[in-house]
From Swiss-Prot:
Keywords: Chloroplast, Membrane, NAD, NADP, Plastid, Plastoquinone, Quinone, Thylakoid, Translocase, Transmembrane, Transmembrane helix, Transport. The keyword Nucleotide-binding does not apply. Its main location: plastid. GO terms for cellular component: chloroplast thylakoid membrane. It catalyses: a plastoquinone + NADH + (n+1) H(+)(in) = a plastoquinol + NAD(+) + n H(+)(out); a plastoquinone + NADPH + (n+1) H(+)(in) = a plastoquinol + NADP(+) + n H(+)(out). It is a multi-pass membrane protein. The chain crosses the membrane at residues 9-29, 39-59, 85-105, 120-140, 144-164, 188-208, 215-235, 258-278, 290-310, 327-347, 354-374, 395-415, 424-444, 479-499, 534-554, 648-668. It is found in: Plastid, Chloroplast thylakoid membrane. Its EC number is 7.1.1.-. GO terms for molecular function: NADH dehydrogenase (ubiquinone) activity; quinone binding. InterPro entries: NADH_UbQ_OxRdtase_chlpt_su5_C, NADHpl_OxRdtase_5_subgr, ND/Mrp_TM, NU5C-like, Proton_antipo_N. This is NAD(P)H-quinone oxidoreductase subunit 5, chloroplastic. The gene is ndhF.
Length: 670
């Protein structure tokens, strides 16, 4: 055992220290502590950088000798129940630790510039550190109970960060929507965990898998309970990773600061669901029906997300739907058993999407002094255009991220997405066709965002009377440095997933676990097979890009009316269909409206009914008894006047009344 593993427990603990320090400082020395803004930011970055170094050490150990290491100690022990806590380091854990910490470091450096003049700068870094620590804690968790604890912490931190600017009504509504939607999935996750404990008597991943295999071999497995528990548990990743039909929270989560949007979409919250399914995939594979459910959930999500991204005019919201679509790819890969391809796409997508979101934040940050601080203007691509001339670093890095997400070789996402599409065609042609069609839509909507934002002429002064005479400018060094740093993995990390033995990479974690069995680089037939597989997906992506150039090239976009810049409607018989599709896409396929008219409306009616029942029936009964007692007491109080004659009169009157009542009853009886 390498001595480094003794310190693995520090990984989720180190980022917590800045949060604790900031919390104590704000509660104890609120005014004076605000003067330590730069110190707080630097400290948070330093602790996260230490966590990254520690993660790299474990990753290096896994490269040289891939094995699992568990450290457990009892937390709660009774006669019938034992709960252990600890940490687990294996290939999946090590690669996820490096991914999360590396993206978090760049996001924190970026946040130092982006949030510099925000009054909540210190509070933001406290939330950001706790958010990252929660994700790291989930990654190293060795059992389902510990997973659930950190799962809920991630949900709480996302609520705080999405609603960071809580004075905005839209931000307050968005954080509530994200929190409540994820509660649906979390409740299913909890029931699923309890179901697996009922089946196996354990929360440990390895023990659950071994006991389920034993029960299956001996025909003692309650398959109905297993399916129900698995589906309930799968609800958690459906909500957390924004899969259909619990995807509705993700676009609204863009109301938070852009750095947290990058972290949520790249390496933390939405990645948590994919990670959990990957961790439990050996268990899910016991049921082919469940794997089909996972695969079709991912395929529907991928296609729906791509369709909804086509007509978005908000830059961040367009990227949000692209995240939803790419998460669908990952879930599809897991559903068809393509564990390696799905995890590889999680890695490549994380760096590409972090680059794109931080680039969008740079754009928004430069647009705000020009068009105002209203998100409906500063994030609207209709007011942008020609920004590459004013923001060359942001423009070039955004283009690289766009090419990667479109799956254009040799950028990162090409290697992983192409493998998922090929696996999907091999297992079920329908799934392969959906994945292939989604690749074309991805090329279309991503270059639509790029062209309308960075190419052509700047449109804000022409179409917005309230805009200033300023022009956007390149962001500060602390904001452009992370873009440059993320550009390198976006270009080169895909080469680590080449399906060939490169000679200098012989490690098991890359050649076997991550990219599959190595094949001979010198064999020309292998190259031919590889290019045959990738030609169709790259071809449809290029077709989408060409169609995007046809509609949104600077020349064509400049000749349109303002209301048709981003969503042009052709003349002729197709106009009504195209307009209907744009409206369908802009209105999120009317899924939110459907939920409002069904679940939300009827839940509101039921809540009002129960509130009325509680106030007027249950509270009315209790309050009525109290009121009757009060009135009776008040009435009897006047009888206590201290006069014996009054007491004798009451006694005599009561005695006569009882006699009369007795005689009345006897007469009625006869």
């Amino acid at each position: 055992m390498n001595l480094n593993y003794q310190y693995a427990g520090l990984i989720p603990i180190l980022p917590v220290f800045p949060s604790i320090f900031i919390g104590i400082g704000l509660m104890s020395f609120r005014k004076s502590f605000r003067n330590l803004r730069k110190f707080v930011g630097s400290m948070s970055i330093a602790f996260m950088f230490l966590t990254l170094i520690l993660s790299l050490l474990f990753f290096n150990d896994q490269l040289s000798e891939s094995y699992s290491y568990r450290f457990l100690f009892p937390w709660l022990s009774t006669k019938n129940l034992t709960l252990d806590i600890g940490y687990l380091i294996d290939p999946l854990t090590s690669i996820m630790l490096v991914l999360v910490t590396s993206v978090a470091v760049t996001v924190m450096i970026y946040s130092d510039g982006y949030m510099l003049h925000d009054q909540g700068y210190i509070r933001f870094f406290a939330y950001l550190s706790l958010f990252t620590a929660s994700m790291l804690g989930l990654i190293v968790s060795p059992n389902l109970i510990q997973v659930y604890v950190f799962w809920e912490l991630i949900g709480m931190c996302s609520y705080l960060l999405v609603g960071f600017w809580s004075t905005r009504p839209t931000a307050a509504s968005a954080c509530q929507k994200a929190f409540i939607t994820n509660r649906v999935g979390d409740f299913g996750l909890l029931l699923g965990i309890l179901g697996f404990y009922w089946l196996t008597g354990s929360f440990q991943f390895d023990i659950i898998q071994d006991r389920l295999n034993e029960l299956l071999l001996t025909n003692n497995l309650n398959f109905t309970l297993f399916i129900i528990s698995s589906v309930l548990l799968f609800l958690g990743p459906i909500a957390k990773s924004a899969q259909f039909p619990l995807h509705i929270w993700l676009p609204d989560a863009m109301e938070g600061p852009t750095p947290i949007s990058a972290l949520i979409h790249a390496a933390t919250m939405v990645a948590a669901g994919i990670f959990l399914v990957a961790r439990l995939l050996p268990i899910f594979q016991l049921s082919p029906l469940l794997m089909i459910l996972i695969a079709f959930t991912g395929a529907i999500t991928a296609l729906l997300g791509a369709c909804l991204a086509v007509a978005q005019t908000d830059l961040k919201r367009g990227l949000a739907y692209s995240t939803m679509s790419q998460l669908g790819y990952m879930m599809l890969g897991l559903g068809i058993g393509g564990y390696q391809a799905a995890i590889f796409h999680l890695i490549t997508h994380a760096y590409s999407k972090a680059l794109l979101f931080l680039g969008s934040g740079s754009v928004i940050h430069s647009m705000e002094p020009v068009v105002g601080y209203d998100p409906n203007k500063s994030q609207n691509i209709d007011y942008m255009g020609g920004l590459r001339k004013y923001m060359p670093i942001t423009g070039v890095t955004f283009l690289i991220g766009t090419l990667s997400l479109c799956g254009i070789p040799p950028f990162a996402c090409f290697w992983s997405k192409d493998e998922i599409i090929a696996d999907a065609f091999f297992h079920l042609p329908l799934l392969g066709f959906i994945a292939w069609l989604t690749a074309g839509l991805t090329g279309f909507y991503m270059f639509r965002l790029y062209l309308l934002t960075f190419e052509g002429e700047f449109r804000a002064h022409k179409n917005l009377k309230s805009s200033s005479l300023e022009y956007p400018h390149e962001s500060s060094f602390s904001m452009t440095l992370p873009l440059i740093l993320l550009m390198f993995p976006t270009i080169f990390i895909g080469f680590l997933g080449l399906p060939y033995n490169l000679g200098f990479i012989q490690s098991q974690i890359l050649s076997t676990w991550l990219v599959g069995p190595s094949i001979d680089l010198n064999s020309s037939s292998n190259w031919i097979d590889f290019f045959k597989t990738s030609a169709t997906s790259v071809g449809i992506a290029f077709l989408g890009i060409c169609f995007s150039f046809l509609l949104y090239s600077p020349k064509n976009a400049s000749n349109r009316d303002f209301n048709q810049i981003s969503n042009p409607v052709p003349k002729g018989f197709l106009s009504s269909y195209v307009k209907s599709f744009y409206n369908w896409s802009l209105n999120r396929a009317y899924i939110d409206k459907f939920y409002e008219l069904t679940w939300i409306k009827w839940c509101g009616i039921f809540a009002q009914f129960t509130s009325y029942l509680d106030r007027w029936f249950f509270d009315g009964f209790v309050n009525g008894v109290g009121l009757l007692t009060l009135i009776s007491g008040e009435a009897l109080r006047y009888g206590e006047n201290g006069k014996v004659s009054s007491y004798l009169f009451v006694i005599l009157f009561s005695f006569i009344l009882l006699i009369l009542l007795g005689n009345f009853n006897s007469v009625f009886y006869f």
